Design a protein with these regions (language model features):
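Conserved mixed alpha/beta catalytic, RNA-binding, or beta-rich assembly cores of soluble enzyme
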Residues: 2-9, 16-245, 308-318
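Active-site microenvironment for binding and transforming phosphate-containing groups
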Residues: 230-318
Length: 318
C-alpha cells in the first residue's frame, strides 16, 4: 500500500464542495484521490464542518463566490484547512488560503489530474523552496506561535539559514542543525522562537478476521506514512493479531470490542462503509485512535485502507 502524494500531504483528507452548477465536476474531484470526498453542495454549515474536519477544502465555484464563503470559516494564517478554488468549467485551480499549508501543492496536483492550469503566486514556491509548514506535516507536529512564521519566511527568502535542535528532513535546504543562527526552530519552546510542538501518537487498526501478516503490513503502512515510530504511545484494535504492531513499536496495546465503539460520536469521522453500517458502527480505526488519544486528541491520519485492514492515527500535542 503506497500512499498518494495527497495522502502524505493531507492525511486528514480533502473535502470537496460545489455550487449546483459545479456539482458534476465536484463529484469527479471527490473521487480523484483515495482520501478525497465530495461532501455536497455548499451550505455554511457544511463548509464549517469541512473546515474543522479536513486538511483541505476544494470549492468548485467562481473565485469571488469562493472568497466570500471562505471568509466565513477562515481564521488566522496557518489556521484551518488549505482552501483551493476550481472554476466550474475546470479550467483553473487557484490556491485561496493557506498556500504554504498545502493549497499550492493541492492546486498543482488537482490541475494535473483534470488538465487545468494551476495559478501559483507565492514567492517561496516560485523559488523552489519547500515551505516551513511542510516541516510540521512531515514531523507530525505543529509550529507555534504562528505569528512568527512570516518573519522566518523573510529570512528564508533573503537566503538566511535557520538553525534547528533536530536533524531536518530532506528537502529543507535552508535548515541545519546548530545554534549559531539568528533564527531557530526548536522542540523546546522559548519566547520569541518558533517552536515545533511534537504530537504523541495513537494508532487504531481495523481488520477482517484472521488477517495474515497484519503486523508486518501495518508497520509497512506506518513507514510509508512516515509516522515516527518512537512517538507511538498506544496501538489499539478489535483484532488480537494487531498486538504484534504494538510490540514492534515498543508501544502499549489495547484490545477493543465492537460494543465499545458503537456509542462513539465525532463529526469528523469518515463516511462508514455499508458493512460497518450493517454492524451498527460509524467506524473502527478512526474511533479507536481517537478513544486512545482522549479528549485532547486530534485525528491526524484519516483511515487508510489496505487490502483487508484499515489504519488511522490520532495525536495529542506534547
Amino acid at each position: 500500500m503506497c500512499p498518494t502524494v495527497s495522502l502524505e500531504r493531507f492525511p486528514r483528507g480533502i473535502a470537496v464542495l460545489s455550487t449546483p452548477e459545479g456539482e458534476e465536476l465536484g463529484r469527479k474531484l471527490g473521487k480523484t484521490f483515495s482520501n478525497s470526498y465530495y461532501v455536497g453542495t455548499y451550505t455554511r454549515e457544511l463548509l464549517s464542518k469541512a473546515a474543522e474536519c479536513y486538511d483541505a477544502v476544494v470549492l468548485v465555484m467562481s473565485l469571488p463566490g469562493a472568497f466570500r464563503v471562505a471568509c466565513e470559516v477562515l481564521r488566522g494564517k496557518g489556521e484551518g484547512p488549505a482552501v483551493v478554488v476550481v472554476d466550474p468549467l475546470g479550467k483553473f485551480v487557484i490556491p485561496l488560503a493557506n498556500a504554504h499549508w498545502g493549497a499550492n501543492e493541492l492546486a498543482e496536483e488537482l490541475a494535473g489530474k483534470i488538465g487545468a492550469t494551476a495559478v501559483i503566486t507565492t514567492v517561496a514556491e516560485r523559488r523552489g523552496l519547500k515551505p516551513l509548514e511542510a516541516l510540521a506535516r512531515e514531523l507530525y507536529a505543529e509550529l507555534e506561535p504562528k505569528e512568527l512564521i512570516a518573519s522566518y519566511y523573510r529570512a528564508m527568502l533573503n537566503g538566511e539559514t535557520i538553525c534547528t535542535d533536530f536533524d531536518p528532513p530532506e528537502g529543507f535546504s535552508y535548515l541545519r542543525r546548530g545554534e549559531d543562527c539568528e533564527l531557530r526552530i526548536t522542540t523546546k519552546c522559548h519566547q520569541g522562537t518558533l517552536c515545533l510542538k511534537l504530537y504523541s501518537l495513537f494508532v487504531g487498526i481495523g481488520a477482517k478476521p484472521k488477517v495474515e501478516d497484519l503486523a508486518k503490513r501495518a508497520i509497512k503502512a506506518l513507514e510509508e506514512l512516515r509516522v515516527p515510530k518512537g512517538r507511538v504511545k498506544v496501538v489499539g484494535s478489535v483484532r488480537e493479531e494487531a498486538r504484534g504492531v504494538a510490540e514492534a513499536l515498543g508501544a502499549e496495546f489495547r484490545l477493543f470490542s465492537f460494543d465499545e465503539l458503537r456509542d462513539f460520536k465525532d463529526d469528523c469521522l469518515s463516511p462508514p462503509s455499508d458493512t460497518l453500517k450493517s454492524m451498527g458502527l460509524t467506524g473502527v480505526a478512526e474511533i479507536i485512535a481517537l478513544k486512545l488519544a482522549g479528549v485532547k486528541g486530534k485525528l491526524l491520519v484519516r483511515k487508510v485502507k489496505g487490502e483487508d485492514f484499515t489504519l488511522a492515527v490520532a495525536g495529542v500535542a506534547q
